[in-house]
Amino acid sequence: MTATVNEAPASTSKGATGRIARVIGPVVDVEFSADTMPDQNNALTTQVTMGGTTQTVTLEVASHLGDNMVRAISLKPTDGMVRGAAVVDTGAPISVPVGNATLGHVFNAIGECLNLEEGEQLEVHERWPIHRKAPNFDQLESRTTMFETGIKVIDLLTPYVQGGKIGLFGGAGVGKTVLIQEMIQRVAQNHGGVSVFAGVGERTREGNDLIGEMAEAGVFDKTALVFGQMDEPPGTRLRVALSALTMAEYFRDVQNQDVLLFIDNIFRFTQAGSEVSTLLGRMPSAVGYQPTLADEMGVLQERITSTRGHSITSLQAIYVPADDYTDPAPATTFAHLDATTELSREIASRGLYPAVDPLTSTSRILDPLYIAQDHYDTAVRVKQILQRNKELQDIIAILGVDELSEEDKLTVSRARRIQQFLSQNTYMAEKFTGVEGSTVPLKETIEGFSKIADGELDHVAEQAFFNVGGLEDVERNWARIQKETA
């Protein structure tokens, strides 16, 4: 049961009362008088009684049907809703609490706090509507500062931008949510500041695990969490990202903070939009997606941006259906991102985590204009070695390694060491592997890969590079291996 929230009075007066004319799943048609029709995106409320308990259900106006009828999408289950029931127009869009009061609390898409003790009250002094305009063009500020994570494969080959949008792409079970949780842990340790997490259509168990891990790490009190899980109606899953983003915008625009916004999973946002579009009777577009896919994605992504002096840095997990990157959902998201981290099932199957594909992952600041020359040169050399190794795999599969030239044998040998060294022991995996997590400074990352590419570590066995932090760990492993084989 949701605890009582003590809020400041809304600035808008409530509108008129209508009547429910039809209920079809989460779609509710409501009739108003001609002079009291609610605006598009207005929040409507109705009382539903089931099992002796009465609860308030929020609806959002999605379209005007004519004949004084509006079609609304329910943000809660419609069980118990009946024709003829009264519906009140709130006169305003859905709004959510903003400010410091949100930190250390869990909310749903309509701003109800879910983790208060019975009888506890949350003092909310301000609420913002979730439908807002993106910042004006003259307020935007382009950022090119690198956001160091301490994860070797990311910092070297797909450097993140402070104030940028970062996408973690991957199919089912390759490590998107674990990597998001890892980033939350690292950001709290190394960067501080305020974070907002949006759980969009993901598993309730994962949300519960995340809250527990954040509490253990001591970062829960600096984070606002907004959840619309996969068992909730599509209207909730479609709006929860906007609710979380609104909270993040307040910290950016009013408190002038640099904010971190985590969204897991953007695909579920698209999927919810497709469900709502079908419920509203719109003609589907490519692969069954909604015809407004690009517009809906743009409305969300254009608000996630940096303004003069302040930024929202977002990490977005993006599920790739059937590992098909040409699917319209992930393809539409690509255009909005500053860095893309693609997680590979083939790399994950070899037990190399994080399973980042070094050849397909990209970043707009992987350029000597924005990063140090030695960083750029090392990244290019590493990619060249890995690309050449990939080209040689067919020859190796047919003829074997012995048929390669001496130069190609060296390339393959170094590529294998690089692949092993790209894996890293993470904090989130400590409880599974028993290996302590590590944060590797960028300087050490560049030095390590440069030495491998130069052949300075050709004498070290491949297994010494597996699941380690920096070169010190490699040397320690190599000494242990030599001792065991002596």
UniProtKB/Swiss-Prot annotation:
It comes from the Bacteria. It is a peripheral membrane protein. One of its GO terms (cellular component) is proton-transporting ATP synthase complex. Keywords: ATP synthesis, ATP-binding, Cell membrane, CF(1), Hydrogen ion transport, Ion transport, Membrane, Nucleotide-binding, Translocase, Transport. SUPFAM superfamilies: C-terminal domain of alpha and beta subunits of F1 ATP synthase (SSF47917), N-terminal domain of alpha and beta subunits of F1 ATP synthase (SSF50615), P-loop containing nucleoside triphosphate hydrolases (SSF52540). Its EC number is 7.1.2.2. GO terms for molecular function: ATP binding; ATP hydrolysis activity; proton-transporting ATP synthase activity, rotational mechanism. InterPro entries: AAA+_ATPase, ATP-synt_VA_C, ATP_synth_F1_bsu, ATPase_a/bsu_AS, ATPase_alpha/beta_chains, ATPase_F1/V1/A1_a/bsu_N, ATPase_F1/V1/A1_a/bsu_N_sf, ATPase_F1/V1/A1_a/bsu_nucl-bd. It catalyses: ATP + H2O + 4 H(+)(in) = ADP + phosphate + 5 H(+)(out). ATP binds at residues 170-177. It is found in: Cell membrane. Its main location: membrane. Belongs to the ATPase alpha/beta chains family. F-type ATPases have 2 components, CF(1) - the catalytic core - and CF(0) - the membrane proton channel. CF(1) has five subunits: alpha(3), beta(3), gamma(1), delta(1), epsilon(1). CF(0) has three main subunits: a(1), b(2) and c(9-12). The alpha and beta chains form an alternating ring which encloses part of the gamma chain. CF(1) is attached to CF(0) by a central stalk formed by the gamma and epsilon chains, while a peripheral stalk is formed by the delta and b chains. Produces ATP from ADP in the presence of a proton gradient across the membrane. The catalytic sites are hosted primarily by the beta subunits. This is ATP synthase subunit beta. It comes from Kineococcus radiotolerans (strain ATCC BAA-149 / DSM 14245 / SRS30216).
